[in-house]
């Protein structure tokens, strides 16, 4: 059995390796951290290749991947703002024997997109007016909506999320040299990407990136906001068996 709290704890593990603050009591954030948390959720819902894009392309794997990513960054925001007290622990595992995945009709899928948009705006509004209750309500509702979307679609969200977590933990490098080499590798790789938007995004991410030691690993961080970036040994999650 896998629960929302189990998923939250996996994100906390990732954040602690990245030396990102994890708060267990309600905590407001400075503009830099607040803006990062807002942009991370916004990107996973509306960004290129993310949820809305995957719905429009009828991509079950893309939709599931986006739901996992939205959950990951939302749990991260819950940890950052210390809203763990508002996160209910409920089961996300479904019976694989009876599981049959399906693409939702567009109007049904867009109902979830509207929900997620409304809850994201609620979170954002809470950040802007400094209201902890509004922040936590928006975040936990995003979690609930993602879990519901996956369940109705017949996706194995528990298995997929574990795969995404393993993938995220592979971002880290074993030595400082590996991390520095990874920055150069990703900058060179960016020049070969066929998607112009992804090419620009990757170049922007790794230009000015820096390396930070955390315990026994080295973390590559984006220069403008400290977001953890992928090392050269990062592997993409294979979610096809869960979708």
Regions found by a protein language model. Name each.
Residues 1-243:
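Flexible "arm" and connector segments at domain edges
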